[in-house]
A protein has these predicted regions:
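Key DNA-contact positions within bacterial/archaeal DNA-binding proteins
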Residues: 62, 106-109, 155, 905
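Amphipathic alpha-helical packing elements
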Residues: 2-33, 502-535
């Protein structure tokens, strides 16, 4: 390259790139390093950006940085060697060495410092460690977080990788699908032995971690310290203990079993059947090592002698026990075909101190249901009056607007940008899911049977005695499925069974039947208090549903096809019912659709003949009338027919890669754009094809999205019905707010670190750095767990090509849980303290580090700090009164709340 300033011809050789002579050859060692760095300085002075400089050398920015680091290290190595020679061979002191080399004395001291030498050689040391691992194991994961395991910076790791690439090792990027999040992937970066092909990295069983992760359980750790240490719960799933059927009684339909269908009654005080701190739980209990019970477990005080478990069923008397119970699955990792919750198994100890596994395996327990999201699904609200719909959607809009206004007032730009990004994503999601603001004091509760209650009563300890509440079960067919009941918290029987339950209500079987045939095996309802301000429309039950029992009407027939895709089928019939409600279907038509939905929801679980139900109820005829549409080319389609059903309807779009661009003027997301600098068209779409195995045709690769996400105007999905228009207005408002948030985000500046704050909050900054290091060190372990889970999934699919998506999802979840436990993958959210938040606000943390902290912190906690709210903190006297009232057994949760002037949620916090 000709340099007119020096009138000499230079040729800048770059490692693994161009150059006539080997790297480091010539009269002066490392002269090419010096030339390379000098050229970078020249290009910088000419105004070129780092990216442009990298491109001028034919490198990516990552490769460029690695080459630059190597050049700097080699230049420094020359300086260190020179300084040492002058000191050791010529006897010069630091001052003399500095004058000789043209450096100041502090730089000389740094060159001769052994710690500095270690830092300089960090990349070489890392390269040696990685090389050894490749030689021993093969393909090695070198993705995010590995640099922390090596205790070096990412730049030093990239430098080490560049060194290894010079030796012929190859680096590839890729991805591993997240086991429990279809459509999402964990990025993969690996280094492989020379000659490895890119496709080989997708044999996940052969991708190894740099370090070996051996995880000791808490039990092993504690027992090593104390041999008498007692563990309450297994650290992972243990094959269940089995109940002797001699201890089990079945209560059949004729004996009252239907009134408590799905309830498992337990003898109180029996060690191997103890529910722990819960009054109730959704459980699985193995019986005789070949069958199992599933349902809601509660305590009972009237079991016959010799019986410890009583199961209620709607099956007729004379049905053999093995037909009442479920057969265990052949998979020892999942014998119940359902996932047991973390901590859902426990141990008990006999009089001699011997450990035994409890018979109880919990799917969910008291407190789990009350944590469900509180909002109003369109499936319910769209069937109510327009004034209620408008009110709740307007509240949701105002809540979002207030949140946006608050975020815009925040002064910390990094926090502001992070929360604006999160806010925009939430708004995009809100537009698709169409969920309105919750009604006052609504909550999700699990239902338990109290046969002695009247058809107009409910035992609901979290609501006021005497008030009226509406119950809504999902999937929701219409207003004819909504019972309005009066709270009776004085009912002695209910109080003895349920007590001050955190998230359960008691009803009788007639009420459950009206709720689209709900069972007492873990079914839930949304409870909404009704009054003059909150009027819920409830209409009489449909005559076509009276006495309808899907299990009796459509039992299994030999040779019939058993449903596998419950979620898909429920989506189809739910959309049909929604469209029928909006388009004014008759009661008879609605009854047909709802009867079929009742069959569908239990078809897989109870092997019901849903195909016959589809014929008997003429579902095809209902689709023809309420969902038929003709496109612009004259093609007939059946499916989602209104905005409410179309919003979440899937649509295939060209496959995309990476994140969308944000339009600077509008804030809208763009997958294609015209580059303002070059005028060239840029695209995030992936132009890939594959051969369809079924048709043999070559087709373009696509991905799934939703109709609402893909449209810029929700009204394109509406038929013009007033209720649809209310939801269209809401969706467009959310889309607009999301765009505003993104526009605000890209116009927000960067954080300027404050020197005084950095010094003042040195301790807090160090604490946050340490917490971040722990959080980021989990990344390689999580990748290893994902790789292991995917390897298991591949083997399962190979052995069971007909496995359902639902079953595969369960098995993947279980495989991932097990893998995480094995390698110790446990993402620990950074718990930011008030003092650390003070340091963040003062500018003691750099922009880049704060971004990383926020990505690994509890975002709700960050939001809480950034938006201080008045929190209810009770005095010790009030806490004492609260506990006294609860422990007396004479007051419900709602009555305690009323007496103390606080909410029931605050009472539950102190329970």
């Amino acid at each position: 390259m000709y340099n007119p300033e020096y009138d000499e011809l230079y040729h800048y050789g770059i490692k693994r790139r161009s150059g006539r002579y080997p790297w480091g050859s010539g009269e002066q060692p490392y002269q090419h390093s010096t030339d390379f760095l000098a050229r970078i300085d020249e290009l910088k002075k000419s105004g070129m950006s780092e990216k442009e400089i990298a491109e001028s050398f034919g490198l990516s920015t990552t490769q460029f940085r690695a080459q630059r680091s190597m050049a700097k290290d080699e230049r420094r190595a020359l300086q260190v060697a020179t300084a040492k020679r002058l000191r050791d061979k010529e006897g010069m002191n630091n001052s003399e060495i500095g004058r000789k080399m043209g450096l100041n004395e502090s730089t000389v001291r740094s060159l001769l410092n052994e710690n500095s030498a270690l830092k300089m050689n960090a990349a070489k040391t890392a390269a040696e460690i990685i090389r050894k691992a490749i030689d021993e194991k093969g393909i090695i994961d070198i993705g995010t977080g590995v640099e922390r395991e090596l205790n070096i910076s990412r730049e030093k790791l990239n430098e080490a990788l560049a060194m290894l690439e010079l030796e012929g090792y190859v680096v590839y990027g890729g991805g591993v699908q997240q086991a429990t999040n279809p459509g999402q992937q964990t990025n993969l970066k690996v280094i492989c032995p020379p000659g490895t092909e890119h496709k080989q990295i997708y044999d996940y069983a052969n991708v190894n971690s740099l370090k070996e992760y051996v995880m000791e359980t808490e039990e092993k750790q504690m027992k090593s310290l104390d041999p008498n240490f007692r563990v309450d719960k297994p650290s992972h799933f243990v094959y269940p203990a089995s109940l002797d059927s001699k201890r089990l009684q079945i209560v059949y339909d004729e004996e009252g079993g239907t009134k408590k269908d799905g309830v498992i009654e337990l003898r109180r005080g029996v060690k191997d059947l103890d529910l722990g701190e819960s009054h109730y739980a959704q459980v699985r209990i193995m019986v005789d090592n070949k069958s199992y019970l599933k349902g809601m477990a509660i305590y009972s005080d009237d079991l016959p002698d010799g019986i410890d478990v009583r199961f209620n069923t709607n099956k007729a008397k004379g049905t053999p026990m093995e037909k009442v119970l479920k057969d265990i699955k052949p998979n020892p990792e999942n014998p119940f075909g359902a996932l047991i919750k973390e901590g859902g198994q426990s141990y008990w100890y006999d009089e001699k101190g011997k450990q035994h596994l409890s018979l109880i395996n919990k799917r969910a327990e008291e407190g789990d249901w009350g944590e469900w999201s509180n909002n109003l699904p369109s499936q319910f609200l769209s069937k109510q009056n327009t004034s209620l719909i408008k009110r709740q959607l307007d509240i949701a809009k105002n809540d979002r607007q207030s949140e946006f206004d608050e975020i815009c007032c925040w002064t910390n730009p990094t926090v502001k940008k992070k929360l604006l990004e999160s806010f925009a994503e939430d708004c995009d999601s809100a537009a698709v899911h169409l969920k309105a603001a919750a009604l006052p004091r609504q909550s999700y509760q699990v239902i338990l049977p109290i046969p002695e209650l009247k058809d107009t009563e409910i035992y609901a300890p979290n609501y006021r005695n005497g008030e009226k509440v509406a119950l809504i079960r999902f999937p929701h067919g219409g207003t004819f499925e909504i019972p309005i009941l009066t709270v009776n918290n004085k009912h002695k029987k209910a109080k003895s069974i349920i007590g001050n339950a955190k998230d359960a209500v008691g009803i009788n079987s007639s009420v459950a039947e009206r709720l689209s045939g709900a069972d007492f095996d873990g079914d839930t309802v949304m409870v909404v208090p009704t009054n003059s301000r909150t009027k819920i429309t409830s209409t009489p039950p449909l005559k076509g549903l009276e006495g309808f029992d899907p299990k009796k009407q459509y039992p299994y027939k030999e040779g019939m096809k058993v449903m596998k895709a419950t979620g898909q089928q429920m989506g189809i019939i739910s959309n049909l019912i929604t469209d029928m409600n909006l388009k004014g279907a008759s009661e008879d038509e609605l009854a047909r659709a709802v009867r079929h939905s009742m069959v569908v929801i239990d078809a897989e679980k109870h092997k019901l003949n849903y195909k016959q139900s589809e014929i008997d109820n003429d579902i095809a005829g209902l689709k023809e009338r309420y969902q038929k549409s003709v496109d612009s080319e004259g093609n007939i389609h059946y499916g989602a027919g209104t905005l409410l059903s179309r919003a979440k309807s899937q649509v295939s779009v060209p496959k995309r890669k990476g994140n969308a661009w944000i339009n600077e003027d509008t804030g809208a997301l763009e997958w294609e754009r015209i580059n303002k600098k070059t005028g060239e068209k840029e695209s995030k779409y992936v132009d890939e094809t594959y051969v369809d195995k079924k048709t043999g045709k070559t087709v373009k690769r696509t991905q799934k999205s939703t109709k609402m996400y893909e449209t810029s105007d929700a009204r394109t999905l509406s038929t013009g019905h007033p209720k649809e228009e209310l939801y269209a207005d809401y969706a467009n408002y959310m889309k607009s707010l999301a765009n505003k948030a993104r526009k605000e985000m890209i116009s927000t500046g960067n954080l300027q670190q404050n020197k005084e704050a950095k010094e003042k909050y040195k301790k807090e900054a160090a604490e946050l750095k340490a917490a971040l290091n722990v959080a980021l060190k989990n990344a390689p372990r999580e990748r290893k767990a994902q790789l292991m889970a995917n390897s298991v999934a591949k083997a399962i699919i190979a052995d069971n090509p007909d496995i359902t998506k639902k079953e595969l999802k369960k098995l993947k979840t279980q495989a991932l849980t097990k893998a995480r436990l094995k390698v110790g993958a446990n993402k620990q959210k950074i718990e930011i303290t008030e003092k650390q938040w003070e340091a963040i606000q003062a500018g003691a943390i750099s922009e880049n580090r704060l971004k990383q902290i926020l990505n690994n912190a509890d975002i709700d906690k960050v939001r809480e700090y950034a938006t201080p709210k008045n929190r209810t903190v009770l005095s010790s006297a009030k806490i004492g009164k609260l506990k006294t009232m609860l422990n007396s057994g004479n007051y419900t949760t709602a009555e305690v709340a009323q007496a103390l002037g606080i909410s029931t949620s605050t009472v539950k916090k102190y329970m």
